[in-house]
């Protein structure tokens, strides 16, 4: 949108996000003012502007729909967000010995140790003292900055942890999430730790995500996505619930584009995170509610038991222990394989990458839901006719219509399974497996119209610029990783292998000098395998250099992204397989890169 010599831009304070002060060196302090950033011509050059526009758009659409059903007291609606931030913490001294971790944020080579996460003994276990000191100090600093941190715990992989705050208005929650990442990075450094926000820093163990718990509230603080005791007769809940499902059905590919990054590409669909197929999980009770509404029948009895006014549980669980009270079971279990799941009174967008800002995914989700709300409001206006407000039967008629339309997106099973891949294809749900393919969804005519006309949160140039930036960032990331791997091979991996090979060769010479038969000596087999592996790695390094050169010379950034995906990534994966085998063979004293067993334990 702007050429190199056009440099003027403007910042405007976002008054919905409070100012804050951070301590700086030499007993000084810095006042930070959250702002939007626009160009001389008024184009949005940041992520905050589009998010604020989407918040305004969804508020207008939601208020319009609420007024149609008689909720005329509501003047404004806000989207709320609670962000679960996952990350790894490793020793900073060891991290500095790994150029790939320092430069790329992930290990480009490294074999999985015998023990990693298979015992499932790290999740929710006791935190190491240095980690606990780091996270608790981070929480204290964040409290001073107004960030309402709430929970912390061990995650599944060794060295992996999570922090989460109380939900807030979406734009403020995004600001606070970015602030959390910054403060955690700074505090970890003081404790001689390195925080890794990369989605897949270690191959073979779980990666990290950023679960975005999204909901809609009125200006009086009522959560619109709270099902209440009888969701089947709650018109407000039903309308907004089905609107969100329909939004994902219509624009799931757009949500896939929002989470497409070079780092998240390593995590999605890896049997540890949601797949690249966007679907919606509702749970048994709400599935039954929608099915009953669609079929115009009574809902099955779920033995609802209410504990307090804010918590609706399912059946009672009696542990048969006199000293323990019975507890109320939730109406629905969690499906951790679903990328977009309803969890009690909110939707959890689980596919967002741990390193990326939540702003863009939430912006596109808001836009998709806004379009759905407007479409549903149009239908409801037609059906209610001359009546002042729509009746419950009018609402159910419209809801029924959109239940049928959006049914293909609902899936309650295992999203990791091959059966779901095949079933999704039958339902016509796209399976987008690469970033370049996902980026193109932003300029798909249907999605582009939503973002620039129906819900105008971007101008056409703004949207095209983001498409260009996504491709450019993807290409640069892979070029950096490819060049880093080249350096690792030349400066670390091959020299280590040659040193060990020299020792084995000298051992064989000594054995031969003593008159021993070395033709079947185990040293000879090891020597030959090292030779085979180093030869193959060297050949593939040449292929990698050619791929890097070809991508670097490609002027069309979209074509360059496709080449980077198909050529650079493939060669890097091939190299890694041989290097990881070599790591298992070379004696530890010769292997100059810290191994997973040292980094994670």
Q: What do these predicted regions represent?
A:
Residues 1-197, 206-467:
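Glycine-rich, acidic/polar active-site loops that bind/position phosphate-bearing ligands
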Residues 201:
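Glycine-rich N-terminal segment of FAD-binding domains in flavoprotein oxidoreductases
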């Amino acid at each position: 949108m702007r050429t190199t010599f056009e440099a003027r831009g403007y910042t405007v304070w976002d008054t919905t996000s409070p100012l804050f002060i951070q301590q700086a060196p030499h007993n000084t302090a810095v006042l930070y003012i959250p702002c939007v950033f626009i160009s001389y011509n008024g184009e949005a050059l940041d992520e905050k502007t589009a998010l604020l526009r989407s918040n305004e758009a969804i508020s207008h659409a939601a208020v319009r729909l609420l007024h149609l059903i008689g909720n005329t007291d509501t003047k404004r609606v806000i989207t709320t967000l609670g962000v679960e931030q996952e990350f790894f913490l490793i020793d900073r001294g060891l991290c500095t010995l790994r150029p790939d971790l320092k430069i790329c944020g992930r290990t480009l080579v490294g074999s999985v140790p015998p023990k990693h996460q298979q015992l499932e003994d790290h999740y929710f276990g006791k935190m190491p003292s240095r980690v606990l000191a780091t996270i608790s100090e981070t929480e204290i600093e964040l409290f001073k900055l107004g960030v309402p941190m709430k929970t912390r715990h061990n995650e599944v992989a060794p060295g992996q942890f999570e922090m989460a705050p109380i939900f807030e208005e979406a734009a403020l929650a995004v600001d606070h999430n970015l602030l959390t990442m910054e403060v955690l990075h700074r505090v970890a450094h003081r404790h001689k730790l390195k925080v890794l926000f990369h989605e897949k820093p270690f191959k073979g163990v779980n990666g990290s995500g950023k679960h975005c718990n999204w909901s809609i509230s009125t200006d009086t603080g009522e959560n619109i996505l709270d099902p209440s005791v009888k969701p089947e007769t709650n018109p407000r809940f039903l309308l907004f619930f089905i609107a969100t499902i329909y939004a994902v059905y219509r624009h799931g590919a757009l949500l896939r584009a929002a989470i497409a990054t070079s780092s998240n590409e390593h995590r999605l669909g890896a049997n540890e995170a949601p797949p690249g197929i966007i679907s919606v999980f509702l749970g048994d009770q709400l599935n039954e509610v929608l099915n009953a509404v669609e079929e115009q029948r009574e809902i099955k009895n779920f033995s609802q038991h209410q504990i307090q006014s804010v918590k609706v549980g399912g059946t009672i669980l009696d542990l048969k222990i006199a000293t323990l009270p019975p507890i109320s079971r939730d109406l629905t279990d969690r499906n951790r394989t679903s990328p977009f799941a309803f969890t009690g009174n909110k939707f959890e967008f689980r596919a967002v990458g741990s390193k990326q800002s939540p702003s863009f995914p939430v912006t596109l989700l808001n836009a998709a839901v806004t379009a759905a709300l407007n479409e549903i409001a149009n239908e409801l206006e037609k059906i209610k006719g001359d009546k002042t407000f729509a009746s419950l039967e009018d609402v159910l008629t419209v809801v029924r219509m959109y239940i049928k339309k959006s049914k293909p997106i609902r899936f309650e099973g295992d999203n990791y399974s091959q059966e779901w891949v095949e079933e999704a294809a039958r339902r016509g749900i796209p399976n987008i497996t690469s970033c370049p393919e996902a980026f193109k969804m932003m300029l798909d005519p249907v999605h582009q119209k939503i973002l620039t006309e129906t819900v105008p949160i971007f101008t056409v140039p703004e949207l095209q610029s983001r498409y260009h930036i996504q491709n450019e960032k993807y290409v640069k990331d892979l070029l950096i990783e490819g060049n880093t791997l080249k350096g690792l091979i030349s400066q670390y991996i091959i020299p280590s292998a040659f040193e060990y090979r020299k020792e084995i060769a000298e051992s064989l010479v000594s054995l031969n000098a003593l008159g021993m038969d070395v033709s079947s000596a185990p040293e000879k087999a090891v020597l030959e395998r090292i030779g085979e592996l180093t030869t193959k790695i060297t050949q593939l390094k040449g292929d990698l250099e050619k791929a890097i050169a070809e991508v670097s010379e490609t002027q069309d950034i979209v074509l360059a992204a496709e080449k980077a995906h198909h050529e650079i990534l493939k060669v890097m994966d091939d190299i890694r397989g041989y290097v990881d085998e070599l790591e298992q063979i070379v004696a530890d004293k010769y292997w100059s890169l810290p191994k997973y067993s040292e980094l994670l334990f």
